[in-house]
Amino acid sequence: MAKKVAVIGAGVSGLISLKCCVDEGLEPTCFERTEDIGGVWRFKENVEDGRASIYQSVVTNTSKEMSCFSDFPMPEDFPNFLHNSKLLEYFRIFAKKFDLLKYIQFQTTVLSVRKCPDFSSSGQWKVVTQSNSKEQSAVFDAVMVCSGHHILPHIPLKSFPGIERFKGQYFHSRQYKHPDGFEGKRILVIGMGNSGSDIAVELSKNAAQVFISTRHGTWVLSRISEDGYPWDSVFHTRFRSMLRRVLPRTAVKWMIEQQMNRWFNHENYGLEPQNKYFMKEPVLNDDVPSRLLCGAIKVKSTVKELTETSAIFEDGTVEENIDVIIFATGYSFSFPFLEDSLVKVENNMVSLYKYIFPAHLEKSTLACIGLIQPLGSIFPTAELQARWVTRVFKGLCSLPSERTMMMDIIKRNEKRIELFGESQSQTLQTNYVDYLDELALEIGAKPDFCSLLFKDPKLAVRLYFGPCNSYQYRLVGPGQWEGARSAIFTQKQRILKPLKTRALKDSSNFSVSFLLKILGLLAVVVAFFCQLQWS
């Protein structure tokens, strides 16, 4: 008899968890508190309690080829970086393709998840839900928590003396939807993550002046990388990941600094991170430097104090007549339907084995999916988590002892602090490729490069030096997809397809350019020998 699995949430993590359950022959039921799928990526004009919220202009920071699910490439005519509405369209196509909607109970809130009395032997959970003011309960063999971590706004008002006397408007970035109504105003954005930068750029088009306050500075990275390809298809390769792992930290720091400053010198713009030793997640924004050059945005240090109409900064400068303050200060998270003893959140941190399993449970039948912030796309990350979890639920994969898991949690946390620092925004941070490979190894889906070098050297080279995308984890092992190899070799075609909207005649410019380079090199060689002859 198939095991019954409760999936909490029908966002990205919930949808892929449903599919993985079905793939493994499990019987899932998904509880979604709203009326539709998509989670944080479904824009709504109004902010709703208990639901993630985005602004209307949000575009993905990871490209389509690096973000799609492993056996379902995005349509080739989709843009490389997707507006939230386009990404939601992909999720709808995905859900329809794999017939996932029939497993979802919409407008159903999970009130509690509790161990059954015989949990130590059965591993079962009693899940209490509410729909249309009616409570129901059911017993499940396992639970997958996919409720996200961008719901509870973090506004540290105590860190801003004088906020109580500020006469202007202030709110968390979660409440921001579009620039209407902010025309001609002087606006202070506090926090320079992706949301803060996006909002500052958008408002700067029509505001009188926008200021953005950053405590530690940040690297700003363009979505466009070498030869115009998406940044993550260039940055996230196994070769580059290996270099970042084995080279001395000082060398890695230097490499990252050179790469980040290739676009513009961050020191000149007042953005250089205070501690460059940490691998802080960069801000992905193509407009920040141009808005700074235009003077539409001005970078400021930490806010020291607020008055009725002005902001005083730690460097002693003062900005008068501030109309609006937007706190882009991140989120905290909690699981109100779980007992604290199950998944305890302290200082925005949770102790989970590989960011997924509580280590202390007698039975490994509770898992958190997507509770992580990789330096890459969350979609393939959540998918590999769900693939592993469902195989653990089914008994095809096993977890180590509680002691071993706790040691791993401690060691992983120490490594995270060493790499990323102790900021609240970094508590879920992890390296991307290394983590994907780690999960793939657990389920037997990591490609064997030594074997491939002999069997399929062309593919081996592509896997090691090319973009590390999700298709690679469908080449071997459980869930193998026969289209994976083809998807890997045709990804460039799908990247370029939406860009080539203007027909061009065949041109010999490339060959002429190449010939000129050769002639130039020969000229240098001839000049060198002529100089030797006359000396």
From Swiss-Prot:
The modification N-acetylalanine is found at residue 2. NADP(+) binds at residues 60-61, 195-198. Keywords: Acetylation, Endoplasmic reticulum, FAD, Flavoprotein, Isopeptide bond, Magnesium, Membrane, Microsome, Monooxygenase, NADP, Oxidoreductase, Transmembrane, Transmembrane helix, Ubl conjugation. Gene3D superfamilies: FAD/NAD(P)-binding domain. It is an enzyme of class 1 (oxidoreductase). InterPro entries: FAD/NAD-bd_sf, Flavin_mOase, Flavin_mOase-like, Flavin_mOase_2, FMO-like. It holds the Pfam family FMO-like. This is Dimethylaniline monooxygenase [N-oxide-forming] 2. It comes from Pongo abelii (Sumatran orangutan).
